[in-house]
Amino acid sequence: MATFADLPDSVLLEIFSYLPVRDRIRISRVCHHWKKLVDDRWLWRHVDLTLYTMRPKVMWHLLRRYMASRLHSLRMGGYLFSGSQAPQLSPALMRALGQKCPNLKRLCLHVANLSMVPITSLPCTLRTLELHSCEISMAWLHKEQDPTVLPLLECIVLDRVPAFRDEHLQGLTRFRALRSLVLGGTYRVTETGLDMGLQELNYLQRLEVLGCTLSADSTLLAISRHLRDVRKIRLTVRGLSAPGLSVLEGMPALESLCLLGPLVTPEMPSPQEILASCLTMPKLRVLELQGLGWEGQEAERILSKGLPHCMVIVRALPKESMDWWM
C-alpha cells in the first residue's frame, strides 16, 4: 500500500496547500524533506490568515520567513469587534507588505479597523483590493488625495463597509486603471451619489450592486447613462421593473447579466419581458438568474429557447466559494 513517502513532491505540495497556515508550519518539523517542501515558493502564493487571531509579532515573522516575494494573494483579518485594547492593523505592516512582497496583487481585509491606516500605506502593486466588514475614515478615499495611490488597481470590492458613502464613491475616480467595482450592502450610497459617481467612472467594465438600499431600476438607469462600455452587470432585483430593465436595451458591449433574488418585488419583469430586453443586446452571451425560484420552471424553458446564442443559468443562490483567490 502506498504511503506518503511514495507520493511525488507535486502531489504533496497540492495536499499541503489545503492545510491552514499553522498546520503547514507544524508539518515542516516532521522531517527535513517536508521542511524543504513547506519552503517551496508555490505553497505561499495564496495565504489565508483569517482563521486565527494573528498577533502582530506572528504576522511579522510570517512575512519575513515565508511570504516575502512569493506572495501573490493575502487574506487577513483585523480586530474591529475585539475592543480598544486589541492589536490593530498598522500602517507600518501595510508598508512592509509593499516593500517585502513585490508580487502581491490581491489583498482581502476582513473585520479590520482601517481608520488609522491611510490608503497611501497599502502596497502599490495591488490590482485587487477587497474590504469585508471593515471600518474606514471619511478621508480614506477622499477625492483630493494623491492621485498616484494604487496606480495598478483594477478591482475594488466593498462588502458591508458601513462608512462608505457618496463621497467615497466619487473618490474612486482617482484609480484610472479601475475596471471592476463591487458594492455589497453599502447602504449609505444614494441614487444621486451613484449617478454622479458612475458619471466619472465611465470606464468601468464590471459593476455589481448587491444588497444595497438602491432600487434596481435606479441602478440600471445610472448604468445606461454612463457605462456604455460595461461588459458585466450583477445586481439584486429589489425594485426591478420591466421599464427599468428596458433601459439596458441596445447596450453595445454587455456580455453578462446576472439578476439575484430573493424575489421580493411585485413589479419583477416576466420571463417574456426579460427575453425581449435581452434580444436587443448584441453581445450578450450569459444570462444568469439566481434565487428567483424559477429553476426547473416554464421561465427557464422560455429563456433558454429564446436565447440560443446565450448561456442561460437559472439556479438557487450558491454558497460562497472557499476559493477566495479565484
UniProtKB/Swiss-Prot annotation:
LRR repeats lie at residues 51-78, 86-111, 161-185, 186-211, 212-236, 237-261, 266-291. Transmembrane segments: none annotated. Keywords: Leucine-rich repeat, Repeat, Ubl conjugation pathway. InterPro entries: F-box-like_dom_sf, F-box_dom, LRR_dom_sf. Residues 1-47 form the F-box domain. GO terms for biological process: protein ubiquitination. Pathway: Protein modification; protein ubiquitination. Signal peptide: none annotated. This is F-box/LRR-repeat protein 12. It comes from Bos taurus (Bovine).
